[in-house]
């Protein structure tokens, strides 16, 4: 009887069961003839729901957003024409430390040995190229050669993704998805975490406490990896034990409570908020918890802290004169919290430097809409049930300046920086968190890259509010390096929603040219639960934040640096 049951169990069934066991509830797909049998197997699993996407780029970005909400996601595409497009969102998941399982169908196992030239390929019989490419953008890539190998390879890839907080790649030939294999063993073999080495953890905490005892003005800088490591609770515990000022990198907004008395703002060099920049430069030591220093977060390398750094990463700790491997962030912060000496010198200084709250002008109803008025009205929308997505561009700066109430979530893609990311990512996120109000701030140029996924929001009746700021161009590129290529064709965005509705959709597209029209549109959006609401907010092309102008200037200068050690002939 057991043998008979196992004979009915297939590679596709194995993958479906493992995905369900690790917590996947929705899998994002674009069908193609190399993955159709596999899709049938995934569809048949009672705990998995298939979510079709408009294209493979959007599919991968929707899975990226889902991983933000769920901790792990799955994207299923066809060979080459599908996977190569999905590599973009997979790259985002790698850069942003998100476990995304990219699954691709592939040619029949008989074709390579017979030197067949197949469709959807490069036109030669070597079909390893996609697998080789996937190795560069995942923590683990596997190509299943035989059904008997599937359990071992699938388990290897999933465990690697979960432990590394990075994407993995699983390639399944079209004739193996329905081939028989054994049933899976206990899921703990995949999901059991690797804990800190006890000796390394104790030594790291002891040395770190001694190191910090010698500092007069320490400050904590929180980066995006703190959230990916799930260390928010331990971070608060450690910060309160230290008593010092806590600043956040822009990509870490929302990972430390903004109403906490030790929160001093966003550290972003010349475009920092509150007094964060002054506090960082006044400090004599910085504890970097999950920090990422790249050209964007350092404003073109002009805002790299010039003080000793203690780096607390997801699995190791480094500070001047010491390095400790296999030390998990959560455990280290908890251990260190019990050993540090309370030192609130930076908070005393912050109280002296803390700026007064800025005056916020409330526009009259008939006033033309402006960027500041949009931000003011969005601020009033934020609650403890809000998840705010900000796309690459001025939406970054507008979103960073908003005050998050306790419980509100903030999502940004600053390492990968893909314009248009927010539309499919918010869709994927909202499917996993239907209890939250997902709001998107996106520019018109970014929206045009991934606009098709609004149709899936309509299809699945996802009540996302899209605040589309229409200033007729790629404003962020204008500030970095202007040119005619930054001009785009204007769309009637509000009317576009009607095309997505067709005869059975319930999305709403609204146009706001004035402050009053925006206020009215927001009321409609907040009461509409049968699909997305897109509010096209028209503003002047030159109406952008001064922070974007400043930041763009420095990033442009960094991009324009001449090659090193190159002689220049007159």
From Swiss-Prot:
Reactions performed catalytically: a 2-oxocarboxylate + H(+) = an aldehyde + CO2
An MF annotation (GO) of this entry: identical protein binding
Catalytic activity, EC: 4.1.1.1
Major enzyme class: lyase
PROSITE patterns: TPP_ENZYMES (PS00187)
Pathway: Carbohydrate metabolism; pyruvate metabolism
InterPro entries, alphabetized: DHS-like_NAD/FAD-binding_dom, PDC/IPDC-like, THDP-binding, Thiamin_PyroP_enz_cen_dom, Thiamin_PyroP_enz_TPP-bd_dom, TPP-bd_CS, TPP_enzyme_TPP-bd, TPP_PDC_IPDC
Keyword Calcium: no
Spans annotated as Thiamine pyrophosphate binding: 394-476
GO CC terms, sorted: cytosol
Free-text remark on how the cofactor is bound: Binds 1 metal ion per subunit. Binds 1 thiamine pyrophosphate per subunit.
Named cofactor requirement(s): a metal cation; thiamine diphosphate
Residues that coordinate or bind Mg(2+): 444, 471, 473
Subcellular localization, as worded in the UniProt entry: Cytoplasm
Residues noted as binding substrate in the record, renumbered to the chain: 33, 120, 477
Keywords: Cytoplasm, Decarboxylase, Lyase, Magnesium, Metal-binding, Thiamine pyrophosphate
Propeptide regions on this chain: 1-2
GO terms for biological process, alphabetical: aromatic amino acid family catabolic process to alcohol via Ehrlich pathway; pyruvate metabolic process
Family according to the record: Belongs to the TPP enzyme family.
Assembly behavior: Homomer.
Name of this protein: Pyruvate decarboxylase
């Amino acid at each position: 009887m057991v043998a008979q049951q196992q004979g009915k169990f297939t590679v596709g069934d194995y993958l479906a069961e493992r995905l369900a066991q690790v917590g996947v509830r929705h899998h994002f797909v674009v069908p193609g003839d190399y993955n159709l049998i596999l899709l049938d197997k995934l569809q048949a699993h009672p705990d998995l729901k298939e979510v079709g996407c408009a294209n493979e780029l959007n599919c991968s970005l929707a899975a990226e957003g889902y991983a933000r909400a769920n901790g792990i996601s799955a994207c299923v595409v066809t060979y080459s024409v599908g996977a190569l497009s999905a590599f973009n969102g997979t790259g985002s998941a790698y850069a942003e430390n998100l476990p995304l399982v990219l699954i691709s169908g592939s040619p029949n196992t008989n074709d390579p040995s017979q030197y067949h030239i197949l469709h959807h390929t490069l036109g030669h019989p070597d079909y390893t190229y996609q697998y080789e490419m996937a190795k560069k953008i995942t923590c683990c890539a596997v190509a299943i050669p035989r059904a008997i190998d599937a359990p071992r390879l699938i388990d290897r890839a999933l465990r690697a993704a979960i432990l590394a907080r990075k994407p993995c790649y699983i390639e399944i030939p079209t004739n193996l998805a329905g081939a028989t294999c054994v049933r899976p063993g206990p899921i703990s073999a995949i999901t059991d975490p690797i804990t800190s080495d006890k000796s390394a953890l104790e030594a790291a905490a002891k040395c770190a406490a001694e190191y910090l005892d010698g500092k007069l003005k320490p400050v904590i800088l929180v980066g995006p990896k703190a959230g990916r490591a799930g260390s928010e609770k331990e971070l608060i515990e450690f910060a309160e034990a230290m008593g010092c000022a806590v600043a956040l990198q822009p990509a870490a907004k929302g990972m430390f409570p903004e109403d906490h008395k030790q929160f001093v703002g966003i550290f972003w060099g010349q475009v920092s908020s509150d007094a964060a920049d002054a506090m960082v430069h006044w400090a004599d030591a910085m504890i970097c918890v999950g920090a990422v220093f790249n050209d964007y977060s350092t404003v073109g390398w002009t805002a790299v802290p010039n003080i000793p750094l203690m780096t607390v990463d997801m699995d190791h700790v480094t500070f001047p004169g010491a390095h400790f491997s296999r030390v998990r962030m959560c455990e280290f912060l908890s251990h260190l919290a019990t050993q540090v000496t309370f030192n609130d010198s930076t908070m005393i200084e912050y109280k002296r430097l803390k700026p007064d709250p800025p005056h916020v002008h409330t526009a009259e109803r008939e006033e033309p809409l402006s960027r500041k008025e949009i931000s003011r009205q969005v601020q009033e929308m934020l609650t403890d049930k809000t998840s705010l997505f900000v796309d690459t561009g001025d939406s970054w700066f507008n979103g960073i300046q908003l005050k998050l109430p306790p419980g509100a979530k903030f999502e940004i893609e600053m390492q990968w920086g893909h314009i248009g990311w927010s539309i499919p990512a918010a869709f994927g996120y909202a499917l996993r968190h239907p209890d939250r109000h997902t709001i998107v701030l996106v520019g018109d140029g970014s929206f045009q890259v991934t606009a098709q996924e609004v149709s899936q929001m309509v299809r699945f009746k996802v009540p996302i509010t899209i605040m589309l700021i229409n200033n007729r161009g790629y404003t962020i590129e204008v500030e970095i390096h202007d040119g005619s290529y930054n001009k785009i064709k204007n769309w009637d965005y509000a009317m576009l929603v009607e095309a997505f509705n067709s005869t059975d959709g319930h999305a709403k597209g609204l146009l706001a040219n004035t402050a009053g029209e925006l206020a009215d549109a927001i009321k409609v959006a907040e009461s509409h639960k049968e699909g997305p609401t897109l509010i096209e907010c028209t503003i002047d092309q030159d109406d952008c934040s001064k922070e974007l102008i400043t930041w763009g200037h420095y990033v442009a200068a960094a991009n324009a640096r001449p090659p090193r050690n190159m002689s220049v002939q007159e």
